Amino acid sequence: MAGVSFSGHRLELLAAYEEVIREESAADWALYTYEDGSDDLKLAASGEGGLQELSGHFENQKVMYGFCSVKDSQAALPKYVLINWVGEDVPDARKCACASHVAKVAEFFQGVDVIVNASSVEDIDAGAIGQRLSNGLARLSSPVLHRLRLREDENAEPVGTTYQKTDAAVEMKRINREQFWEQAKKEEELRKEEERKKALDARLRFEQERMEQERQEQEERERRYREREQQIEEHRRKQQSLEAEEAKRRLKEQSIFGDQRDEEEESQMKKSESEVEEAAAIIAQRPDNPREFFRQQERVASASGGSCDAPAPAPFNHRPGRPYCPFIKASDSGPSSSSSSSSSPPRTPFPYITCHRTPNLSSSLPCSHLDSHRRMAPTPIPTRSPSDSSTASTPIAEQIERALDEVTSSQPPPPPPPPPPTQEAQETTPSLDEELSKEAKVTAAPEVWAGCAAEPPQAQEPPLLQSSPLEDSMCTESPEQAALAAPAEPAASVTSVADVHAADTIETTTATTDTTIANNVTPAAASLIDLWPGNGEEASTLQAEPRVPTPPSGAEASLAEVPLLNEAAQEPLPPVGEGCANLLNFDELPEPPATFCDPEEEVGETLAASQVLTMPSALEEVDQVLEQELEPEPHLLTNGETTQKEGTQASEGYFSQSQEEEFAQSEEPCAKVPPPVFYNKPPEIDITCWDADPVPEEEEGFEGGD
């Protein structure tokens, strides 16, 4: 709400006011009112008639202010009265708005003693206004009021006050004190401001120091991190260098160890080769061949067996010299077809030799060639796979076998005309006499060895039937066994023995082909049959097993005329001739020597003993390899069912088919070839040993020394 305004008509208001308060002026009142529609105060009228004249100028529709000077007889100075006129017709809102303007108007007009509020002329009473002006100063006109005033004055107590007389010194002290405190207050404010500044500076300095410390710590951490990374990198490089050195060292050690192993293997190989070469050289230089003794025994036995019958030439290209094994015991019953295809081969002392099939070498190279080449000087030994040798032989025996293989394979067969006898042939010539003397000693014991007879070269007939692997693995009986069982004439025995002597003589002296073994011979003065003890006194009867007779060759007989095993078993045995009486019964042979027993029980024996035991097997393996290289594998005919490869036999004794020498066949026809005889089922094996060791004393001493 806006207040009263004096600015619009300020000069007029003050001029009228001055006229009223001034003593020299005749005017004693002035009337003021609001300008239309505003709060600006203005002068309405003025005069000299006092309260009576002033009360006549008030209006009922306005709010007006009257300033009047009243003179009192009892007072020396006039009194000033301010009348607040509010007309009856003034709106209430205007009344409320102007109620607050009274104090400001009284303040504007200084010296107002009494303010009188009036809304009508009756409210403006000169006596009442004078009474109020004279209250406390003049005596009251009423006696009652006078008594009351006196009574109040008597009972009134003195009023206390703090007013004192002004003292200059005290006032100076007070002023100085105030100045001091003001100065102190200012100083305190300055101090506080300085403290705030100092605190702020300290805070800033602390923050800076903290930031600097953090920066230094960060740099220190980074420095430590870099140092740690450098250390780790150096350690990694050192580790890598150590690993590289370790790898180089291991590689060097491996290379050194590999070189050492290679040197050791090479030295071991050289040592083994030197031992084999030395053994082969010693074997080649010995005067007597221990195998020749058994060949002569086989020839004698075959010649004796041939004297009991007169067989025709065999229609098959069968290899002669297959001895009759004394360990075979055939059964008397059982069909041949079922047993030959279903039964398994028996266990033998030489399992590898049993199942290993070799071609017939006798059709291309004679026995004399092999023996003469074997007596020649040895050559370097080529390496062979371990599978080519027998599983029962020792490493030394395998090496000896390789040496003999190299000797026999590297020497070409000599030309047909006999060359002049050399020193070596002259040295080996006395070996026949020594062998004959040894034969005489051995025949004193109750032993008989199956011999071999020369076989004429015949054209190989193609196999009639294709053989199966099972039938190929079946073992057959040697033709010498059939020859011993078949009847023969005594006259043929003498001729066969003479042929054997002539073949031995040519074999040991000239080392050439034996094409004249069966033709260019002279009858011997004395038969080797007489060398056997008792001259037939200890001869035994033929074996109980039936033998298939030898089929005649050519047009005399055909393959269909060969009786089967069952049919042959029903025929009566022929009478034993005079030549057959000289043969011993193989069932009555003594036990074989312990050196040719089951090799599976001799694993723990010494090297020397194993070399002695496996020498025949190693030498025979050489012949088997030569047979495989020089001649295709012919087939034999079984009991009318399928063809069977030559090189299989039912069982092995000391002279198994795989272990025996492959005797060469002559190109000219020989006396006879006994047919093969087969069993209905695999025969039983009688593992026996001979009392006498067939190895010569010189060879035993040499191999025992190794």
Curated annotation (Swiss-Prot):
Residues 357-366, 382-396, 639-651 have a biased composition (Polar residues). CDD domains: ADF_drebrin_like. Residues 3-134 form the ADF-H domain. The modification Phosphothreonine is found at residues 379, 383, 394, 550. It comes from the Eukaryota. One of its GO terms (molecular function) is profilin binding. Residues 209-236, 288-298 have a biased composition (Basic and acidic residues). Residues 411-422 have a biased composition (Pro residues). Expressed in the hippocampus, with expression in the pyramidal cells of CA1, CA2 and CA3 and in the granule cells of the dentate gyrus (at protein level). Highly expressed in brain, also present in stomach and to a lesser degree in kidney, colon, and urinary bladder. The E2 isoform is specifically expressed in adult stomach, kidney, and cultured cells. One of its GO terms (cellular component) is dendrite. GO terms for biological process: actin filament organization; cell communication by chemical coupling; cell communication by electrical coupling; generation of neurons; in utero embryonic development; maintenance of protein location in cell; neural precursor cell proliferation; positive regulation of dendritic spine morphogenesis. Transmembrane segments: none annotated. It is found in: Cytoplasm; Cell projection, Dendrite; Cytoplasm, Cell cortex; Cell junction. Actin cytoskeleton-organizing protein that plays a role in the formation of cell projections. Required for actin polymerization at immunological synapses (IS) and for the recruitment of the chemokine receptor CXCR4 to IS. Plays a role in dendritic spine morphogenesis and organization, including the localization of the dopamine receptor DRD1 to the dendritic spines. Involved in memory-related synaptic plasticity in the hippocampus. InterPro entries: ADF-H (IPR002108), ADF-H/Gelsolin-like_dom_sf (IPR029006). This is Drebrin. Residues 209-497, 633-677 are annotated as: Disordered. Interacts with RUFY3. Interacts with CXCR4; this interaction is enhanced by antigenic stimulation. Interacts (via ADF-H domain) with ZMYND8 (via N-terminus); the interaction leads to sequestering of ZMYND8 in the cytoplasm. The modification Phosphoserine is found at residues 141-142, 241, 344, 385, 387, 393, 468, 658. It comes from Mus musculus. Keywords: Acetylation, Actin-binding, Cell junction, Cell projection, Cytoplasm, Developmental protein, Differentiation, Neurogenesis, Phosphoprotein. PROSITE patterns: ADF_H. The modification N-acetylalanine is found at residue 2.
